């Protein structure tokens, strides 16, 4: 295990370089990201196994996420709390080479298109997703998940929990798009998750009125994270405030979102596209889920309970569907539990390089850890 401490800053996002096996970027904020500066750290693992800072950029607001430019080895994009995205060249000092500003609230996520490598997207508290080109300051397209009421398709008995005071923040954040991602298989597909507990799947080739499917993913509680499986184009995972990880088959989504939820037992809801579930995967909300780049049935999660976990998706054995669920397994499919962080874990990423299983994680404790989750 390797460690790097970002003195005075809390980690929000981390990503390995797609070009260099020893380089990482970390997005961070001072004062837990609540107020004050942000900082982009460019780190390298040297030959002696130490993590060293090779460059950094101080920003005027917290950084919530980042993405390496898939077509330029020295460029990193960051999502900033003032509603802007900033593109930095790691060979320069101090200033970004481009600023993109259209969002009206904090930008919570950014993601580079892995297929065409020419576009990137952003998602924001303002309820929108924007698609950009690094060659122009204006966005190419704005996507807005349909405004869906939290209880629209939830049975009133099951929605009682929403009336508890501890969940009053959900109504305030219902339009916040916490994360959005391009599909690694199709440059035209975008997946997002929002505070209204819905995930949205967009096909940007279609007209705006017909380009999305919305499906309830976390029982009326905020959906905080989502990811496409790297090998199974039709499989996605989500995580949220209900402490659960759910795995979905997007081929089973109905075109009309009102039909995606079907009653099977009075007072209960069933979504036909949910193919697996890890209930109570963590003790607190799940902030990040990400599929392995080396295995089709392994994923990682990071949580407010200060841990990262590696899971095996028991519904697939790596070659075919097994029709099993993690919820019926004694270990829930858990492979490894990383417990070295002492604060909320926000960011985690798999290494593309070397022996499969190496990951990096960062948290509010200001630490970046590099560790092996597969032994």
Curated annotation (Swiss-Prot):
UniProt keyword terms in alphabetical order: Cytoplasm, Peroxisome, Protein transport, Repeat, Transport, WD repeat
Pfam family, one: WD40
Segments annotated as WD repeats: 58-89, 102-133, 172-203, 218-249, 281-312, 340-372
GO biological-process terms attached to the record: protein import into peroxisome matrix; protein import into peroxisome matrix, docking
Domain of life from the UniProt record: Eukaryota
SUPFAM superfamilies assigned to the protein according to its UniProt record, in alphabetical order: WD40 repeat-like (SSF50978)
Name of the featured protein: Peroxisomal targeting signal 2 receptor
Source species taxonomy: Eukaryota, Fungi, Dikarya, Ascomycota, Saccharomycotina
Gene name as annotated: PEX7
């Amino acid at each position: 295990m390797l460690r790097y401490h970002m003195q005075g800053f809390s980690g929000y996002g981390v990503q390995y370089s797609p070009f260099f096996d020893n380089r990482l970027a970390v997005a961070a904020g001072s004062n837990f990201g609540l107020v004050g500066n942000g900082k982009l750290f460019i780190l390298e693992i040297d030959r002696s196994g130490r993590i060293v800072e090779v460059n950094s950029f101080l920003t005027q607001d917290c950084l919530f996420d980042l993405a390496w430019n898939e077509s330029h080895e020295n460029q990193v994009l960051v999502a900033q709390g003032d509603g802007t995205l900033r593109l930095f060249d790691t060979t320069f000092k101090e200033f970004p080479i481009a600023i993109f500003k259209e969002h009206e609230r904090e930008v919570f996520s950014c993601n580079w298109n892995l297929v065409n490598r020419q576009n990137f997207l952003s998602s924001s508290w303002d309820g929108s997703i924007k698609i950009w080109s690094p060659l122009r300051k204006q966005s190419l397209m704005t996507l807005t998940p349909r405004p869906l009421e939290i209880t629209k398709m939830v049975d009133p008995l099951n929605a009682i929990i929403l009336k508890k005071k501890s969940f009053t923040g959900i109504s305030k954040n219902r339009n916040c798009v916490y994360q959005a991602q391009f599909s690694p298989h199709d440059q035209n597909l975008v997946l997002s998750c929002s505070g209204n507990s819905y995930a949205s799947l967009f096909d940007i080739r279609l007209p705006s009125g017909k380009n999305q499917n919305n499906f309830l993913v976390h029982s009326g509680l905020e959906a905080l994270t989502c990811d496409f499986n790297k090998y199974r184009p039709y499989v996605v995972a989500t995580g949220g405030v209900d402490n659960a990880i759910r795995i979905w088959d997007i081929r089973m989504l109905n075109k009309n979102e009102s039909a995606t939820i079907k009653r099977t037992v009075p007072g209960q809801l069933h979504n036909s596209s949910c193919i697996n579930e890890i209930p109570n995967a963590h003790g607190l909300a799940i902030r990040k889920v990400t599929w392995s780049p080396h295995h089709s049935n392994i994923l990682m999660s990071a949580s407010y309970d200060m841990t990262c976990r590696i899971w095996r998706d028991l519904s697939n054995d790596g070659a075919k569907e097994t029709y099993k669920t993690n919820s019926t397994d004694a270990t829930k499919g858990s492979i490894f539990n990383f417990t070295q962080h002492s604060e909320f874990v926000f960011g985690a990423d798999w290494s593309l390089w070397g022996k499969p299983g190496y990951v990096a994680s960062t948290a509010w404790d200001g630490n970046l850890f590099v560790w092996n989750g597969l032994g």
